[in-house]
Design a protein with these regions (language model features):
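Generic detector of short, locally flexible boundary/turn motifs and exposed helical patches
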Residues: 2, 26-29, 133-137
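N-terminal small/polar loop signature for handling phosphorylated ligands or for N-terminal nucleophile
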Residues: 8-86, 186-212
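Short glycine-rich or small-residue beta-strand-to-loop segments that form or flank ligand, phosphate
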Residues: 6-12, 169-173
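Gly/Ser/Thr-enriched, mixed-charge loops and adjacent short helices
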Residues: 67-69, 85-209
Length: 212
């Protein structure tokens, strides 16, 4: 789409999202894209990726709605609520998402062109050899603490002090999804009476099958 800023990437808890993210990194880094990856090597919910994009772009001339070429965008590797046999790439534009049909249609058309050509022309690198001769610079892969950024910024938009003062007891069920680490961190950061009632990670998404 012509953006030259960093790309923020995250993944959900599906079993194949990790390998899919690695494949995306191989292609992105091979094409000289600076990629912001989760410093904890954990799961990243879409709102955290969106917030990171907005924070970066807000510092540019014209802000989030500007036209600066070095705006950031992002990818969340997730098929959302679909079964574990499915995979997906969700593109987040500089606005933080969701992408409009112009963007998604362009991406789909380009991907199908490569598939029809048996991936001819797709550059890839070896993630274990970054910085070595013939490989991208290791500096293109940048650790980024999505969790800390998101949890700290949450207090800018929610009156969590009032919630804490009211003594509200909160039960949070991540439903096997990417927010599994975030709820506990929110409760700890803001001293809330918050219990994560089901912190298990459902890589097979069996909790969905229970409702089929």
């Amino acid at each position: 789409m012509g953006y030259t800023g960093p790309l923020y990437i995250g993944k959900d808890t599906h079993l194949l999202s990790g390998p899919a993210q690695d494949t995306a990194l191989e292609v992105l880094l091979a094409n000289g894209v600076t990629v912001m990856v989760d410093a904890r090597e954990r799961f990243t919910p879409t709102p955290a990726v969106s917030r990171a994009i907005l924070r970066h772009n807000a510092e540019l001339p014209g802000g989030v709605t500007g036209t600066a070429g070095d705006r950031a965008d992002g990818i969340v590797v997730t098929p959302s609520h679909n079964p574990p046999t499915d995979g997906g790439f969700k593109y987040n534009p500089p606005s933080g998402g969701p992408a409009d049909t112009d963007a998604t249609s362009w991406i789909a058309d380009r991907a199908n062109e490569y598939l029809r050509a048996s991936l001819k022309g797709v550059a890839r690198c070896n993630l274990n050899q970054l910085g070595q001769p013939g490989q991208p610079a290791a500096s293109l892969k940048v650790p980024f603490d999505y969790l800390d950024m998101y949890v700290c910024d949450l207090g800018l938009v929610l009156d969590l002090e009032t919630i804490r003062g009211a003594g509200v007891r909160i039960g949070a069920d991540p439903l096997g999804g990417a927010s599994v680490d975030y709820w506990g961190a929110i409760g700890e950061q803001y001293d809330l009476s918050l219990t994560v009632v089901n912190p298990s990670v459902a890589v097979s998404y069996t909790h969905l099958r229970a409702h089929e």
